[in-house]
């Protein structure tokens, strides 16, 4: 047990993001980590596999948090017993996204689905040219930051900026 999770680093969350790591950590591995390392208190689950997420939810130790790492799957995960989200979209549209999450936490999933439906196109746009380019482009479109990015990142395209300007105006996302 000579690992970072057993050397007193405090509570940690495991990140399950196959899109970044190129491999998927199985539900069984997640559950073994949850049982064997008590300071791993939860997982940011972005496998895109709702059945895998359900196996984790059904078999997790008491107190182990399962947080969505995929904004578009958050309400489905919470509906199944998930605990919340570590969100990209909340960086660009915090009030609107939190409205969806707070409705879901109260069990008002139909209302949460409707609220997210008004946000879905903008959330999808955040990932059109990759993260964090989409978030930065959305914030620049609202006049909150400048469009300049540090290498190796590049500014969002003119098409993406135009798309955000339209969506921000249409859905009152400022």
Where are these regions (language model features)?
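Preference for short coil/turn "hinge" residues that link or interrupt alpha-helices
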Residues: 2, 18, 33-36, 137, ...
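Short linear Ser/Thr-Pro motifs
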Residues: 3-6, 46, 68, 87
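Short, conserved clusters of charged catalytic residues that mark active-site
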Residues: 4, 51, 114, 118
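Single conserved hydrophobic/aromatic residue that forms the stacking wall/gate
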Residues: 1-13
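Alpha-helical scaffolding segments of alpha/beta enzyme cores, especially the outer helices
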Residues: 7, 28-35, 55, 99, ...
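Structured C-terminal cap/extension of enzyme domains
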Residues: 72-174
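Ligand/cofactor pocket segment of small-molecule handling proteins
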Residues: 11-78
């Amino acid at each position: 047990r000579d690992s970072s999770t057993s050397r007193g680093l405090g509570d940690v969350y495991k990140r399950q993001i196959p899109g970044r790591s190129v491999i998927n950590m199985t539900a069984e591995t997640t559950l073994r980590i949850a049982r064997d390392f008590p300071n791993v208190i939860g997982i940011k689950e972005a496998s895109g596999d709702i059945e895998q997420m359900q196996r984790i939810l059904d078999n997790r130790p008491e107190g182990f948090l399962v947080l969505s790492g995929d904004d578009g799957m958050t309400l489905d995960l919470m509906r199944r017993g998930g605990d919340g989200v570590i969100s990209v979209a909340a960086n660009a549209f915090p009030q609107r996204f939190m409205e969806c999450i707070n409705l879901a936490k109260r069990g008002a999933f139909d209302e949460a689905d409707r609220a997210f439906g008004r946000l879905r196109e903008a959330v999808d746009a955040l990932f059109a040219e990759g993260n964090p380019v989409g978030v930065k482009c959305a914030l620049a479109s609202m006049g909150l930051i400048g469009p300049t990015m540090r290498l190796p990142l590049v500014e969002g395209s003119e098409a993406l900026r135009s798309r955000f300007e339209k969506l921000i105006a249409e859905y009152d996302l400022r």
